[in-house]
Amino acid sequence: MSDRDLFAGLLAPRSFPGWVELLLPRIEARFQEGRHGDWPAWMQLLGELPKVVPTRLDFAQNAVRIEGDTDCDGATRRSIETALRRLHPWRKGPYDIHGIFIDAEWRSDLKWRRLEGAIAPLAGRRVLDVGCGNGYHAWRMLGAGAKSVIGIDPTLLSVVQFLAVRHFAGDWPVAVLPLGIEDFPAETRAFDTVFSMGVLYHRRSPFDHLVELKGCLRPGGELVLETLVVEGEAGRVLVPEGRYAQMRNVWFVPSPPTLSSWLTRAGFRQARLIDVSPTTTQEQRSTGWMRFQSLADFLDPEDPSRTIEGHPAPRRAIFLAEAP
């Protein structure tokens, strides 16, 4: 299957009317800039995954669960696990695929638990998830009743992990595409809810990012924004001169009052804080499915309230806001 056919199939008109014409040229332009060197091997891996008919699917529990009654004996299960482990590292999860538990670096279900009761109900809504990783939250959005979910993330391995999960889940109105927000059409005003989680602090211009998100929302649509914050009054912003928790590309970490004012200045209405939580080593950690260093390695061993660079340890805030 060609790359074009692969992504055109994800954007099937019955689920995403009009989006093939808008997004496919942008995906093709992205691939013209160069593919990841492992892309052919990943496509071969996807093509060789066993075909197991799902009989039970649950996108509303902590682990996105896909099960089947037949066609998944021990040998098949071992084959599936071997293939999925070749897609290491798994950053977001957990997943339970035919009894194979993918214990990803992030307990992404904990973040979902913090926001699910506060956001506008997703039933019947068209959703965009910016910086979606491998699509764990996109499946949870579908489980919460979303009509359709488009996730975008420029990391090709994350897209391949989504495609592997989708292979076993079947055809659902959810797609993860290899695009960044800067590649997405401006001012579509097409979505009822837009999520941006773990993206804002990676942007050199946070205001540009907020304006891009606003342009994706219909009037009255809801933004769900999750990002790193520091404690402090309005006006306080941490601008790391070097790394932050070993991340090179952290540009701005505002206080919650500062972020609220940014949302208002960017044109959003009714900005409100719904949660602030420290990131713990129970939520982000190394596992058998993500064997590299993780949060525990990035904190000061003598004072875990600081990063190894001396900055305040990660705290994350969730804001809701309404598009005008």
From Swiss-Prot:
Quaternary organization: Homotetramer.
EC number: 2.5.1.-
GO biological process: tRNA wobble uridine modification
Superkingdom of source: Bacteria
InterPro entries: CmoB, Mo5U34_MeTrfas-like, SAM-dependent_MTases_sf
Catalysed reactions listed for this entry: carboxy-S-adenosyl-L-methionine + 5-hydroxyuridine(34) in tRNA = 5-carboxymethoxyuridine(34) in tRNA + S-adenosyl-L-homocysteine + H(+)
HAMAP family named in the record: tRNA_carboxymethyltr_CmoB
Top-level EC class as recorded in UniProt: transferase
Protein name: tRNA U34 carboxymethyltransferase
PANTHER family for the chain: METHYLTRANSFERASE (PTHR43464), TRNA U34 CARBOXYMETHYLTRANSFERASE (PTHR43464:SF95)
Keyword tRNA processing belongs to the record: yes
Keyword match tRNA processing: yes
SUPFAM superfamilies the record matches: S-adenosyl-L-methionine-dependent methyltransferases
Binding site residues for carboxy-S-adenosyl-L-methionine: K92, W106, K111, G131, D153, P154, T155, I181, E182, M197, Y201, R316
Family: Belongs to the class I-like SAM-binding methyltransferase superfamily. CmoB family.
Gene: cmoB
Function recorded in the entry: Catalyzes carboxymethyl transfer from carboxy-S-adenosyl-L-methionine (Cx-SAM) to 5-hydroxyuridine (ho5U) to form 5-carboxymethoxyuridine (cmo5U) at position 34 in tRNAs.
MF (Gene Ontology): methyltransferase activity; transferase activity, transferring alkyl or aryl (other than methyl) groups
Keywords: Transferase, tRNA processing
